[in-house]
């Protein structure tokens, strides 16, 4: 299934990718029309697998090529892209398709039997599912690795360490520095921000006089790396907070909203309920530059003020300089509470935080340009979803690389080899988790957060170094990872690492 829980923005778009400027076309081809000998042999440096293509369904349909795509090759001549993660293949039906992208064409498949084929040019991984001890080894010199990771850094801290991220040649992550940035994945459009406020300030003030808290906290995912509950618990000492969900719950939700409380969608009844609050505590579960989710964009959409902690660079993407309240700008929870009370009691100053609802008040050109120029769309039938967009990016990059390699082999003096491409830590690298409030050295040894997240972060570094060692030694058995980690640890203890 292409769209997982956190891949909601791509839901329903697979059939419409043909309409976008990258002109993605999905084709299936009957396998019995393609004899085995048309496929390149495998890399015999490892082993000879059975033909994966005998089990693949193909059927010829019209191709929708982009204006820059002059690729006239038949399917038997195209490079292959292998989607490695089980259950994530952004096409249907079957497990193999042809894609015709902006500049070139490829075959894409989820059938792992093609892993060692020479025509398999790149393997695409879903970051949440990537495990060092399950990596496709040996890593072949003719293949690149591509990473798709739009989810929280907490899902896989392997990717936040340099030895891990630099194993990949192409990236699509929430970081703006990645090759195919997904930074605004939870912001469907500019119109989403401009939607009129759902509940008027007059109504919010009336509810406040009746005893409703000014601040909403809605969370059922507790014990996360950002340690948000620890901060909120301290904040509650200084200002009234209505907390729903499993974490720090002090008020019950109406029964009819219980099933939608943790949804990332926008069920009208739930949205109208939370829109009554002036301020929403918007804490990401992991802290990393450019990691921003619906927790930030949803209150802006509703006309509430997000009180935000997540991306330290969030101000770079706000509509203007006063659309969100950044928690890290305050020295303490008490100082933040004092400021929120001040806004609660001063309508004119509170209203300044909603001025972005007028298009003329959106002054952030970075935000406007990013929304205007991104190649993928969210619920936009004129653009591909970001899964299909990224695979087309990889397809075009790989065809360019392969063409440059052929030219170099033909005339090395006139055609230099293509430059090696490797992801850097800026494509993902997220910091060591820190306590939501206070200093790590002040936490008791049996603190639950302390026992989980710092350890998980550093164990992920061990695995990144271990996999890098496996690849460097041309190992074919990923289960040897633990032996390599032990060897690295011993060398480090002797001061030789």
UniProtKB/Swiss-Prot annotation:
Residues 406-427 are annotated as: Disordered. One of its GO terms (molecular function) is peptide-O-fucosyltransferase activity. The keyword Cell inner membrane does not apply. The chain crosses the membrane at residues 7-27. It catalyses: L-threonyl-[protein] + GDP-beta-L-fucose = 3-O-(alpha-L-fucosyl)-L-threonyl-[protein] + GDP + H(+); L-seryl-[protein] + GDP-beta-L-fucose = 3-O-(alpha-L-fucosyl)-L-seryl-[protein] + GDP + H(+). It is a single-pass type II membrane protein. The keyword Metal-binding does not apply. Disulfide bonds join 392-395. Pathway: Protein modification; protein glycosylation. It is found in: Endoplasmic reticulum membrane. Glycans are attached at residues 169, 474. Keywords: Disulfide bond, Endoplasmic reticulum, Glycoprotein, Glycosyltransferase, Membrane, Signal-anchor, Transferase, Transmembrane, Transmembrane helix. It is an enzyme of class 2 (transferase). Its EC number is 2.4.1.221. Residues 1-6 are cytoplasmic. It holds the Pfam family Glyco_transf_10. Residues 28-497 are lumenal. One of its GO terms (biological process) is positive regulation of protein secretion. GO terms for cellular component: endoplasmic reticulum; endoplasmic reticulum membrane; Golgi membrane. Gene3D superfamilies: Glycosyl transferase family 10, C-terminal domain. Belongs to the glycosyltransferase 10 family. Protein O-fucosyltransferase that specifically catalyzes O-fucosylation of serine or threonine residues in EMI domains of target proteins. Attaches fucose through an O-glycosidic linkage. O-fucosylation of EMI domain-containing proteins may be required for facilitating protein folding and secretion. This is GDP-fucose protein O-fucosyltransferase 4. It comes from Oryzias latipes. The gene is fut11.
């Amino acid at each position: 299934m292409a769209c997982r829980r956190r891949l909601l923005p791509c839901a329903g778009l697979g059939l419409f990718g043909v309409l976008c400027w990258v002109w993605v076309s999905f084709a299936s081809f009957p396998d019995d029309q393609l004899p085995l000998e048309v496929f390149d042999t495998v890399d015999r440096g490892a082993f000879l697998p059975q033909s994966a293509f005998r089990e693949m369904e193909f059927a010829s349909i019209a191709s929708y090529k982009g204006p820059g795509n002059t690729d006239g090759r038949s399917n038997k001549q195209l490079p292959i892209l292998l989607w490695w993660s089980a259950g994530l293949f952004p096409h249907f039906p079957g497990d193999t398709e042809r894609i015709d992208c902006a500049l070139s064409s490829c075959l894409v498949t989820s059938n792992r039997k093609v892993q060692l084929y020479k025509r398999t040019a790149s393997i695409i991984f879903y970051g949440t599912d990537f495990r060092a001890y399950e990596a496709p080894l040996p890593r072949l010199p003719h293949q690149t690795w591509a990473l798709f990771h739009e989810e929280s850094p907490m899902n896989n801290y392997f990717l936040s360490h340099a030895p891990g991220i630099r194993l990949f040649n192409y990236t699509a992550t929430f970081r703006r520095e990645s090759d195919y940035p997904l930074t605004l994945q939870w912001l469907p459009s500019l119109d989403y921000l401009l939607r009129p406020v759902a509940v008027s300030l007059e109504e919010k003030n009336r509810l406040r006089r009746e005893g409703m808290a000014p601040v909403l906290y809605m969370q059922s995912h507790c014990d996360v790396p950002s340690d948000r509950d620890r901060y909120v618990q301290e904040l509650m000492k200084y200002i009234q907070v209505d907390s729903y969900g499993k974490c720090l719950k002090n008020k019950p939700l109406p029964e009819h909203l219980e099933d939608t409380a943790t949804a990332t969608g926008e069920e009208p009844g739930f949205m109208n309920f939370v829109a009554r609050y002036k301020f929403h505590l918007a804490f990401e579960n992991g802290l990393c530059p450019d990691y921003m989710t619906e927790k930030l964009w949803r209150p802006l959409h509703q006309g509430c003020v997000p009180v935000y902690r997540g991306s330290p660079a969030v101000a770079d993407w706000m509509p203007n300089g006063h659309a969100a309240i950044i928690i890290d700008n305050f020295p303490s929870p008490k100082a933040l509470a004092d400021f929120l009370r001040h806004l609660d009691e001063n309508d004119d100053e509170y209203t300044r935080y909603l001025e972005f609802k007028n298009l003329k008040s959106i002054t952030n050109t970075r935000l406007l340009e990013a929304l205007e120029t991104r190649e993928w769309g969210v619920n936009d039938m004129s653009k591909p979803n970001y899964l299909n967009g990224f695979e087309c990016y990889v397809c075009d990059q790989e065809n360019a690389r392969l063409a440059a390699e052929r030219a170099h082999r033909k005339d090395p003096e006139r055609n230099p080899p293509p430059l090696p491409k490797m992801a850097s830590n800026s494509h993902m690298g997220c910091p060591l988790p820190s306590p939501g409030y206070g200093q790590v050295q002040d936490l008791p040894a049996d603190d639950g957060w302390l026992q989980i997240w710092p350890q998980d972060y550093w164990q992920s570094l061990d695995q990144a170094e271990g996999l890098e060692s496996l690849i460097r030694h041309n190992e074919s058995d990923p289960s040897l990872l633990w032996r390599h980690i032990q060897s690295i640890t011993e060398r480090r203890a002797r001061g030789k690492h």
